[in-house]
Amino acid sequence: MTLMYDAIVAGGSITGLLTAREIAKKGNSVLVLEEGFEVGSPEHCGGLVSKSALNDLGIEPSVKSFDSKIESAKVFSPNGNHFSIDSTSQQIIVVNRRELDKQAAMQAQENGAEIIV
């Protein structure tokens, strides 16, 4: 038996899943191939993002995926120089990447994408 898809996405990380979601939204058949034993595992990077970036991507962090909010930070260089960042206007948040990836997978599937792990 031969299966045909309009698109095959290699990798079930946030980028691959959002790509699959957008392709599927247009009515195309999409297959996502993830090498891990489940979407979101292992985590590949931290989850420090702006709320506006998530909004632009069509993601509203669920309670499970939202860890905390960053209002300010001090950044230190190896030579001791440092500067402060006020991020209250940017709404910088820390998300649980595993849960955020699972949320993106659910969005992709709701739009018709298939995911194989």
Residue ranges and their predicted role:
Residues E35-K74:
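N-terminal FAD cofactor-binding segment of flavoenzymes
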Residues G16-L17:
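N-terminal Rossmann-fold NAD(P) dinucleotide-binding loop
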Residues A20, K51, A105:
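Short glycine-/small-residue-rich flexible loop motifs, especially phosphate/cofactor-binding loops
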Residues V75-V117:
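Conserved N-terminal helical subregion
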Residues S13:
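Glycine-rich NAD(P) Rossmann-fold beta1-alpha1 loop
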Residues I8-A10, R21-H44:
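Glycine-rich FAD pyrophosphate-binding loop
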Residues T2-A7:
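Extreme N-terminal starter segment of soluble prokaryotic enzymes
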